[in-house]
Amino acid sequence: MINKGSGTRKIWKWIGGIIIALIVVAGSVSVYFSIRWKPVLTQKIKDVVYNGSEHLYTLNFKDIHLNLLTGSVTVDSILLAPDTAVFNERKKSGTAPTHLYRVKLEKLQLRRIEILSIYFKKRIEMNDIILEHPSINMIYNKVYKKPTPVKDRRSLYERISKTLKSVHIKGIKIEDADLDYVSGATGMILNSVKHLNVNVKDLLLDEHSKTDTTRFYYTKDISFEMTGYHSLSKNKMYTMKVDTITGSAIGRTVHIRGFKMIPMYPEIQFSKMLKTQKDRYDLAFDQIDFKGVNFYRLNIRGILQAKSLRIKNANAKVFMNREMPPGHGDKSQNFPHMALKRLPVESTIDTLQLRGVNVAYTEYNPISQEKGTVHIDRLTGNIYNVTNDSTSLSKNKYAVADLDAYLIRAAQLHIRINFNLLATNAAFTFKGHIGKMDMVKLNPLSKALGLVKIQSGQVQQIDFDVKASDKGSRGTMQMYYNNLKIELLKEGEDGQPAKKKGLLSFLANTLIIKDENPSKGKPVRSADIVFERPPGASFFNLLWKSVFIGMRETVGLGIIPMKSPEEGRKVVVKKLEERKEKREDRKQENQDKKQNRQEKREKRQARRAEKKAAKEQS
C-alpha cells in the first residue's frame, strides 16, 4: 500500500512538472512572439486604415499589448484622424465623402484574434472589437460629385488585397460614446449626443462580400441606441428630451420613444418674454417610427428617404396670446408645406401616419380676459408624398392629408387637405365634413373668443370646401342645424365673469339669427367663406377661422361686419389702456385712503397728547 501511494505521488509530480514546463514554454513563446510580432501587427493595422481609406485617414496610438495565449490585443491612446489635405484634393475632384470622422479613445480591445493567420495567411480573424466611451466628431461637409476622367472604381477589398486576403470580425461594439455632429464649413457643433451605443454585426471584407445583398457596408447589420438625450433650444425657451432612439441599417428602421419639447415658462409669461405674438408649443410624442429608411442615400448624399413615418400617442399644445402686439413677419412661411421647404435636409417620406394625436390650439382674448381652446382629439390618418426633394417634386408636387378626428370634443371631423408643395404663395385646398353636434359644447370657445354664449342648437352636419393661400381663403359651406338661440355678452371687469346683453340678445335672436337651416319649406342655404388672412395668422388659425366664418354667415351674423385685425388691435390697445388707467386710479385712491387714515391717526394722537399735557399741568 505504501509503495502504491508513493507511485501515485510520483505520477502527479511528473504531471505537475510537465504542466509547469508547458506553461513556462508557452509563456516564453508568448513573450517572444509578442515582442517579435508587435511591430509587425502595429504596421499591419496602420496600413489597413491608411490604404483602405485611400490615404484619407491615419491611425496613431501610444502602445499596443499582445497576448498570444488569449489572442487579445489592447491598444492605448488612439487617434483616428482625417487628412484635410487629402480631403480638400478629393473635393476638387468630386470624390470627397459627405462625412469625415475624428475618433479619440483611451483604450481599444480586440479579442480572440488569430495572430498567426495575419502573418501566414494574410487574413484577419477575430471575435470582437470593443471601444469604451469614445469621443467621436462626425463632420458634415457639403460636397459636390463631379465627373472625372480618372476615378478609382476599385472596391474596398481591392484596395487592401495586396496587404490582406480578408478581414472578418464577428462583432464591433461602441459603448457609451459621445458624438458631436460638426459643420465642416464653420466648425460649429450642430448637435451633440451622449450615451450612444453602436453594434456592428459580422463585418466581412473579402472578394465576395461586396456583392452580398444581405449585407450593409460589408456587415450583417449596424444598429444603434441612444438614451437620455437632452438639449436646450438656441433661444433657451424650450427643453428637448428623448428617452431612447434606436435603429437598424438592415431593418431600415429608426424608433424614437418619449420625445418632448417643453416650454421653459408658463403660457402668459412665455408670450410676454417674446414681445410679439408668437406661438408657444408644448409637444409630447410617445412613439415616432421610421420604416424603410434608405441609409445608403442618407450617408452618401445626406438625403432622408423613408417609406413611412408613424407618430402615435402624441399631444401637441399651441398657445397664442392676442394681448401681445403682432410681429412684422408673415407666419405663412410656417405653414406645414412652406416649413418643409426650409428643412436643411432633403427629405422624402412616402406616407406620414398619424395615430391618436391630440391637438389643442388656445388663444388668450385680452378683451374677455379668458382663454378659448380648439380641441382636435384622436387625430388619425395619413399624409402622402411629404417631400422637399426636387426629383420627387418633378413627379408629384402635391402632398395630400386624409384625416379623421374628434372636433372640440363634440363632433366627428373628416378633412382632406391638398398642399401644393411648389407654390410660392403657400396655396392649398381643404374640404371636410363635421357630423352631429350639440352647439352648446362650443361655449368654451365662443364665450372666450367671441363673447357669444349658445343657449341651444343642434347641428346635423357641416360640409365645407375651401381654397386657401397666404392671402386668406375662399370657399363655401353648408351647415344643417336647428333650434339655435344665443346670448350676446359683454366683458367683465376686475376678473368678473362676462355679462349678458339682454336687449341685444333678444334682438339678435329675433331679427338676426336664423335658428335653422334649411328653413321650413325652403332649400338649404349655402354660405360663402371669405377670410382675409392677417400676416400674423398661423396655419391652424386660418383653418378654424375659415370654418368659423362659414358658420357665422350661415346663422345670419354675416350682416354684422367683423373688425379688421388693425381695428381689433386698436380695441385691444384701448381696452388695455383703460384698464391700466383704472388700476392707476384705484392705486391712487388706495394711497389717498391710506394717507387719510394716517392723518386721522396723527390727529387722534395729537389730541391725546394735548389732553395728557393739560391734565399734567392741572
Give residue spans per PLM region.
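N-terminal type II signal-anchor transmembrane helix
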Residues: 2-55
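Short, surface-exposed polybasic-and-hydrophobic patches located at secondary-structure transitions
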Residues: 126-135, 147-155, 159-161, 189-204, ...
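Interface amphipathic segments
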Residues: 205-250, 256-270, 370-450
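Outer-membrane beta-barrel translocator domains and adjoining extracellular loop/strand segments
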Residues: 88, 142-143, 267-271, 322-324, ...
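Flexible beta-edge/linker motif
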Residues: 39, 47, 52-143, 157-185, ...
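Extended terminal
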Residues: 2-18, 420, 433, 446, ...
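Flexible, surface-exposed loop regions and adjacent strand-edge segments
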Residues: 143-151, 324-329, 450, 492-499
